[in-house]
């Protein structure tokens, strides 16, 4: 039990460090790829709200009403819709959002992470303008959607594609986040495009942490400290799961002893 509280303190300490030293934009949680439970989200909401840090929830799809209801109950600060490929999907997300939140405004972002979405970007932005705040480019899925082994997240093709998309996003009045398997190599490649991306790419993200692009690219250990938060979060999550299953294990043993 003591390990859980110790990890919790380390988690908060790391969050504060990211806020104070690296300009932390927000913490992310996912119902989609991460498969977070409602309990996981409650913990993250408790920790982030105590420190005055925004929490964004990546829902399971454009029209994931159940996820949006959970987001409303938790009081998250933003919603992220994955795999948005068409103007219709943007409209579905906005309608689902309004069905729960009405006129209440929170941060809204959509993920461009397939070839189809990239090719439809201008049509997507026509619907998204004045309604969506941010576009996130998910490089991992986006590169895989081309079915070409030469096209990898850090490839020249992807860097050129991001540059092309970024100008269209900015022209539409939205901010731009880049994510998808960020590594030290990614950061080095991005630095080579820093002049071209200046004023276009707003932030960079790992699975859990969103930092300003300039800080992630230029400040020593920004990526390392972002990943450290996720490591602590996963360790804490595993310890809690271990504790909760231990109660069930003991109960099962008692039941068997009665037979």
Model regions and ranges:
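Expand to "…catalyze enediolate/carbanion chemistry for C-C bond making/breaking, isomerization
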Residues: 1-259
């Amino acid at each position: 039990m003591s390990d859980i509280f110790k990890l919790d303190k380390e988690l908060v300490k790391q969050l504060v460090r990211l806020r104070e030293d690296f300009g932390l934009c927000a913490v992310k949680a996912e119902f989609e790829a991460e498969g977070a439970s409602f309990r996981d989200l409650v913990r993250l909401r408790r920790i982030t709200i105590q420190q005055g840090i925004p929490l964004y929830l990546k829902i399971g799809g454009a029209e994931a009403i159940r996820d949006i209801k959970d987001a409303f109950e938790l009081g998250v600060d933003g919603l992220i819709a994955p795999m948005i490929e068409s103007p219709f999907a943007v409209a579905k997300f906005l309608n689902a959002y309004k069905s729960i939140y009405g006129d209440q405004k929170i941060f809204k972002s959509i993920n461009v992470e397939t070839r189809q979405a990239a090719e439809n970007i201008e049509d997507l932005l026509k619907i998204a303008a004045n309604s969506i705040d941010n576009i996130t480019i998910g490089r991992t899925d986006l590169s895989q959607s081309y079915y070409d082994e030469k096209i990898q997240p850090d490839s020249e093709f992807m860097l050129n594609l991001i540059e092309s998309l970024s100008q269209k996003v900015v022209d539409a009045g939205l901010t731009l986040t880049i994510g998808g398997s960020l590594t030290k190599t990614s950061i080095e490649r991005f630095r080579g495009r820093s002049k071209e991306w200046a004023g276009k790419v707003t932030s960079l993200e790992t699975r859990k942490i969103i930092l300003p692009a300039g800080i992630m690219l230029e400040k020593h250990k920004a990526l390392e400290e972002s990943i450290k938060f996720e490591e602590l979060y996963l360790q804490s999550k595993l310890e809690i799961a271990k504790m909760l299953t231990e109660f069930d294990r003991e109960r099962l043993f008692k039941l068997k002893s009665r037979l």
